[in-house]
Amino acid sequence: LGWRDSDSLPQTLTNKLAAVMREESQDPFAGILSHEEKVDLVPSNLELSALEMSLVTAMSRESVMKNYLSQVKDNYDYVLIDCMPSLGMITLNALTAADSVIIPVQAQYLPAKGMTQLLSTIAKVKKHTNPNLAIDGILLTLVDGRTNLAKSTVEALRENFGCRIRIYRTTIPVAVKAAEVSSKGKSIYAYEPNSTVSKAYADFTKEVLADGRQKERLHASHEHAR
């Protein structure tokens, strides 16, 4: 989003989590960056990988991120936690802190194969640290409808998981413009607003927001019935 030298930032997610681990007082909003496209960001860098080693021996190690986010989340409509494609302590912290999960899966063989392991991890998190964790759905990304590999992978995902996990109608296509975005410091909407991939992300956002409104209505009806 335009902050190119993340290593020079005085405050990152690493500092926030480290303060929670040491039970130090902190201003939870210090260091949160505000982007011109109306998004706030808690930045991260490679130091987070080093902190992951410390989390292994921390007290309540799976709940460190949850404890930090509890201090800021009421100021936002949505908090998105963008996880690395790994199942380490940082990802376990994210799953423990989250209300629900959206699983992006590249329409390729190896990423799709990792679904079973991820679902097993989510099941363990539900059992031990976050019983209310829900899976909102699977988002298919880097979809190249011209290749047989992409078509067969999408079909396999729908066949193996579609009966128990929602697969979003919207798919994110392969696009050169999407690959260029991170180097430009802009979102796809600002960089190429009329592209196929920006339209796909907009359609996906509408799906997610519609789901959220439906959940709110169901919750309200359940509360009214009590």
Predicted features along the sequence, with ranges:
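P-loop NTP-binding core
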Residues: 1-226
